[in-house]
């Protein structure tokens, strides 16, 4: 079964893969990293003017990393906005995904957190650096193959 977003992308010959619907009926699409930025721009023009959330996760030990975007069409007088979930998978060795900061400013800290925790590099992000961990931290704590250090240095909050 194909949703509205998938049908629209097919109509305009944009490469994607439908992953079905979640329990709320929101369609999930898979987009290749090299196609993501152009599809993000097109989605914004199509009316997805709000990035509700962006997160990332490690699919499997030694496997792919995923960056997930929840987009919403906010329109005056519409009480049930149209939503879509987009997943972009990247290889673990060199996870690079185009940043959507220049389309949705709310992606700023969310992409930085995904970088900090999983090491996904968001290309053309204006200030991609750690946001939760110290700059000197080694590794990506939310990766399934991450080995936690035996000790932590206690630091002042000042």
Curated annotation (Swiss-Prot):
Entry's Gene Ontology BP terms: photosynthesis, light reaction
Gene3D superfamilies reported for this sequence: NADH:ubiquinone oxidoreductase, 30kDa subunit
Subcellular location: Plastid, Chloroplast thylakoid membrane
Reactions performed catalytically: a plastoquinone + NADH + (n+1) H(+)(in) = a plastoquinol + NAD(+) + n H(+)(out); a plastoquinone + NADPH + (n+1) H(+)(in) = a plastoquinol + NADP(+) + n H(+)(out)
One annotated Gene Ontology cellular component of this protein: chloroplast thylakoid membrane
Name of the top EC class for this enzyme: translocase
InterPro entries linked to this entry: NADH_DH_suC (IPR010218), NADH_quin_OxRdtase_su_C/D-like (IPR037232), NADH_UbQ_OxRdtase_30kDa_su (IPR001268), NADH_UbQ_OxRdtase_CS (IPR020396)
Membrane topology qualifier: Peripheral membrane protein
Known EC number: 7.1.1.-
Keyword vocabulary terms for this entry: Chloroplast, Membrane, NAD, NADP, Plastid, Plastoquinone, Quinone, Thylakoid, Translocase, Transport
Molecular function via GO: NADH dehydrogenase (ubiquinone) activity; quinone binding
Pfam family, one: Complex1_30kDa
Domain of life: Eukaryota
Keyword Ion transport: no
HAMAP family with a match to the protein in the record: NDH1_NuoC
Family membership noted in the UniProt record: Belongs to the complex I 30 kDa subunit family.
Quaternary data: NDH is composed of at least 16 different subunits, 5 of which are encoded in the nucleus.
Function: NDH shuttles electrons from NAD(P)H:plastoquinone, via FMN and iron-sulfur (Fe-S) centers, to quinones in the photosynthetic chain and possibly in a chloroplast respiratory chain. The immediate electron acceptor for the enzyme in this species is believed to be plastoquinone. Couples the redox reaction to proton translocation, and thus conserves the redox energy in a proton gradient.
Alphabetical list of NCBIfam families matching this protein: PRK12494.1
Identification of the protein by name: NAD(P)H-quinone oxidoreductase subunit J, chloroplastic
Gene responsible for this protein: ndhJ
């Amino acid at each position: 079964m194909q949703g509205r977003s998938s049908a629209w992308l097919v109509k305009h010959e944009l490469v994607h893969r439908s992953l079905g619907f979640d329990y709320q009926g929101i369609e999930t699409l898979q987009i290749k990293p090299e196609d993501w930025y152009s599809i993000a721009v097109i989605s914004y023009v199509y009316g997805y003017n709000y990035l509700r959330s962006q997160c990332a996760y490690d699919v499997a030990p030694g496997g792919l990393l995923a960056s997930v975007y929840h987009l919403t069409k906010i329109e005056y007088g519409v009480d049930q906005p149209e939503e879509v979930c987009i997943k972009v998978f990247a290889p673990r060795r060199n996870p690079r995904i185009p940043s959507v900061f220049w389309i949705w400013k709310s992606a700023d800290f969310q992409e930085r957190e995904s970088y900090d925790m999983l090491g996904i590099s968001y290309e053309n992000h204006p200030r991609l650096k750690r946001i939760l961990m110290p700059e000197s931290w080694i590794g990506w704590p939310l990766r399934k193959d991450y080995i936690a250090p035996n000790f932590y240095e206690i630091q002042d909050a000042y």
